[in-house]
Amino acid sequence: MLTDPDLKSKVDQIWDKLWTGGLSNPMDAIEQFSFLLFLKRLDESEDDRQRQARLRNQDYKPLVPPEIRWREWTNKEAKDALEYVRTKVFPWLKEMGNEGSSFKQYMQGAEFKINNPRLLIEVCNAIAALKISEQNQDVQGDLYEYLLSKLSIAGRNGQFRTPRHIIRMMVEMREPKPRDRIADLAAGTCGFLVNAYEYILETHTSPDILYDDKGQKQLIGDLLSPEQGEFLQKEAFTAYDNDSGMTMLRIGSMNLMLHGIEHPRFFYMDTLSKEFTDKKSYDLVLMNPPFKGKIAEKVVEGKPEDKSANGKRAKQSAKGKLDLGLELPTNCTKSELLFLHLILRTLDMGGRCAVIVPDGVLFGSSKQHQEIRHKIVEENRLDGVVSMPSGVFQPYAGVSTAVLFFTRGDTTNKIWFYDMEHDGFSLDQKRQPVAENDIPDILTCWKNRFNPDFTTQRAERLSELKSEIAPMKAERLKLLKEINRLTFENAIAPADDEPTRLALESDRQRLAQLHEQMAPLQAEINQLNRQFWVTKAQVKGNKYDLSASRYRQIEQDEPYYESPQVTMERLLKLEYVMAEEVRKLDKLFN
């Protein structure tokens, strides 16, 4: 999500310029913005490539001809710049890429639609002012997400961009390798593949050159062999999408190229259809499939087709079953379940997966829900489940989700769970950075989940914290009891009964101080309890329910309850006080 208010303001200005400059179709505005942003990033990436070649002691071979670079034409007069872009820059851009690359394929029908010379220069200056290369994170996907939010389509059909920190968490937990064949079967802007590539480069860059003088990462990949480097460029990454349209296919291909994948393999394909035949093709699948609900409504008698939930036509066979791909159950219409079947089909034996699913997949009681959970647990190895809070996909959706980590083949013995409560951002629509963040702990726990020393240290720390907080909890109960008594006494006491009021105020202040002392201890206890293991027998006994809330044991603070005897005594005393007040009133009137 784009959280920097200054960046938001600058993007708003670009949007307004394009809108008022004649691009009345919002998707046209986004596409033209994308082309210019891509050209700017290409210019910056040339500087990066030159620096990396120097670090590797290699010859520098320019990817972008000098006459095409941003700095060459943006300094021209507006009219000359527009003509230059039309006749030289954009034709080169359309032919950029290797034969067979998805970028070159999708650019063939692209048009440069900015016709106002002044608008071109104003937008270019505004893009330069974004200073994306100086950001401490890749904000390009955030920019697209923010622009798409203006169209109110970012969450259409349940499809919305996965936050970058969630993608990075999933990638780090699955640890992509240089020889992995990696796929995203519903790719959007290809964020998962970009992060997988960056992870491989980072883990194969010499530690002494990984960071520059400013502390920024330099993803050189100098430890990769030439064969590994060529494989990463030409074969490792494959993406599919059919929901986002041609503009997003171009954006996804540009995103891959900007991050160093010069031969993007991003294809327009409905991966749930019969046309998609991949089987045992990938070593790693990373994805966040769209949560559309039903693929198609009930078949109407006599009609060979029926509209799906998103308004598209879904092919039906003569018997009224969905015309789905190989080995996909024709009695299932929920896309989130079908994608899980598809992942299992496309993974090679031993292949790994990290996939985001809506919570309903974890506990749904339908036959189709139970069947896919049974298949993952009994016929494969379910490695882990990370339950995520409902605000992770704000502002586009408040749906609760989880990440499933499983491996094709083998069988499940026990399952690692983590019940995430904080992801480093507020869980409202603003999604502002906050201090509470479980992701570092998730990564640490995952990497050490089979380490007995780590488990012992964590258990010992939990025991220490419980011992430290126990007397505070006991004092808390005593204070609650005294506050309860003083509150009653203060309510029935004369107005000038100062000692009771002061005693009550003092105890309330002490309780607030106690809560402040307990808060960090309780927060650490809660975090230590968020990781736990569940056996296959437990899951099987609960109809393969994978909800963290079903198995996590949460210790609740002992509540304070006054005894019935004291409550009755106070009621009698209150009745007596009220009767006395009534007698006093009666004397006043008589």
Tell where the protein language model's regions lie, with residue ranges.
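Short, contiguous acidic/charged loop-to-helix segments that flank catalytic cores in large enzymes
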Residues: 2, 296-335, 359-368, 389-396, ...
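Conserved Class I SAM-dependent methyltransferase catalytic core
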Residues: 29, 226, 232, 240-244, ...
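S-adenosylmethionine
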Residues: 4, 137, 145, 243-250, ...
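Substrate-binding/catalytic lobe of Class I Rossmann-like enzymes that use SAM or dcSAM, i.e.
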Residues: 352-364, 383-437, 441-445, 453-460, ...
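Helical mechanochemical/support elements of P-loop NTPase systems and associated helical scaffolds
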Residues: 3, 10, 25-29, 119, ...
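Conserved S-adenosyl-L-methionine
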Residues: 159-287, 291-303, 357-360, 368-379
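Short acidic (Asp/Glu) and glycine-rich catalytic loops that position anionic groups and cofactors
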Residues: 12, 230-234, 262-266, 317-322, ...
